[in-house]
Amino acid sequence: MAQSRDGGNPFAEPSELDNPFQDPAVIQHRPSRQYATLDVYNPFETREPPPAYEPPAPAPLPPPSAPSLQPSRKLSPTEPKNYGSYSTQASAAAATAELLKKQEELNRKAEELDRRERELQHAALGGTATRQNNWPPLPSFCPVQPCFFQDISMEIPQEFQKTVSTMYYLWMCSTLALLLNFLACLASFCVETNNGAGFGLSILWVLLFTPCSFVCWYRPMYKAFRSDSSFNFFVFFFIFFVQDVLFVLQAIGIPGWGFSGWISALVVPKGNTAVSVLMLLVALLFTGIAVLGIVMLKRIHSLYRRTGASFQKAQQEFAAGVFSNPAVRTAAANAAAGAAENAFRAP
């Protein structure tokens, strides 16, 4: 067919219509030399180098944020850390609160177990067991050793521990008031020399009332609550009533008695403000001690009536204590033996 179209010349150039590679549909899908790729690049086809690779332009960096001027807050040991979620923080706070609550409960149980252990040890020791004295708390190098054993948390029942502790603090306050009374009387004596008798009596009251009040009314009260002793209750009521009367007299402050009460503070000569203020403070302290003493006497009496104690029980305890005393029994035996010997020698 080609020969018929070209006039039968076999050397004629083929026309574009007879070349299948010149078809417009094929030419459209041929790759362009301007954008040659590695797959279709022919180094022998042209002497021009391939186009240079152009990397994509980098994205612009965000501007740096300004540093915060607010100082970082230090978290407390119990505060949960911020993990970026409100629900997480709430759950962490709840867990921490629950742990603290459990820890407090465990501490209370541990204290209760310690108290019960001390009570069991006290019951195992018994009343006749020997224990090392610990009061007054003197240093080891002191030649005078402690005279009493005192442990309110171990020896006193739990429902009476607060009352016994209050009475112990009352005794300490009365001792402090006597020391301040001595200083006030000394200041008054320095201002007015005719107050020598009151100053001398203030020294006597410090030396006399401090040990006697502890032995005569505090120790009987302590032993009464420790062993539910009716006899010690009666001893305490009698002596502490007298002590309350003395507290009232100390607060009144009769001149010349050695007490810096209200009357003694008000009769200080004018111009001695410091001495007057010191004596008024002592009078106020004496008044507070007197009021607290009366209140505690009434309170302990109400506790005594609820314990089932009575005067007959006190008599029985006194008789049992007297007859169980070895010295009393020895004296009674010697007296009986002497009486019998005299009876046999009589004509």
Curated annotation (Swiss-Prot):
MF GO annotations: ubiquitin protein ligase binding
Location (main, coarse): membrane
Record keywords: Isopeptide bond, Membrane, Phosphoprotein, Protein transport, Transmembrane, Transmembrane helix, Transport, Ubl conjugation
Residue intervals on the Cytoplasmic side: 1-170, 298-347
Tissue: Widely expressed, with highest expression in heart and skeletal muscle.
Modified residues (Phosphothreonine): T37
Modified residues (Phosphoserine): S32, S72, S76, S85
Domain of life from the UniProt record: Eukaryota
Post-translational changes noted in the entry: Monoubiquitinated.
Biased composition (Pro residues): 49-66
A Gene Ontology cellular-component term: intracellular membrane-bounded organelle
Location within or outside the cell: Membrane
Cited Pfam families: SCAMP
Membrane topology: Multi-pass membrane protein
Modified residues (Phosphotyrosine): Y41, Y53, Y83
Chain intervals for the UniProt region annotation (Disordered): 1-88
Residue location of crosslink Glycyl lysine isopeptide (Lys-Gly) (interchain with G-Cter in SUMO1): K313
Single Gene Ontology BP annotation: post-Golgi vesicle-mediated transport
TM regions (residue ranges): 171-191, 197-217, 247-267, 277-297
Subunit-level organization: Interacts with NEDD4, NEDD4L and TSG101. Interacts with RNF126.
Known role: Functions in post-Golgi recycling pathways. Acts as a recycling carrier to the cell surface.
Family classification: Belongs to the SCAMP family.
Protein name: Secretory carrier-associated membrane protein 3
